Amino acid sequence: MKNQCYEHETARTIQDVLSCDGDLKIALVADSHLDNSAPETVENISAVDQAVHFDCCVHLGDFLAGEIGGRYAGLLLRQQIDLFRPAVSNGRFFPVQGNHDACSGPYSERLWPETIGFLDAEPGVCRPARKPYYYVDIAKEKVRLVFLCSYFYEQRGGEPVMIWSCRM
């Protein structure tokens, strides 16, 4: 059931999306930062999806709210991703690691790659050896969506990411 506060916004969004002549429809979310309104956000995306049938949902990162210690960060990040994954009816969900999606200590470099492991089974996704960056091909539209990372544990961007992107 749609939150009544957002009924007007949802109706306007449906109308706007349906009036566009584009073929690719993406539900785009960013900076949820463990917000208490995240369930309502997912509910609203789902309500719009029922009418427009999004091709996927993309979350541009910052699921968390800054550095959180170790395993607690992993638990919170998995909860947030699990909350957003079913936002669109076809289940296609592509998260990006934001600069606040980190944690402290040795666990940090494993956190994001482990959490997005579900992408390895997603059709059309190419993710090099457990890296936080990847791309997905949307075959029906002949589109490649490239997702880079604004927080890379081993190094800040640099040569490996550039080499990978040139080989795509």
Where would I find each of the regions flagged by the language model?
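N-terminal active-site segment of His-dependent metallophosphoesterases
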Residues: 1-74
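Extended active-site neighborhood of metal-dependent phosphoesterases/phosphodiesterases
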Residues: 5-13, 70-168
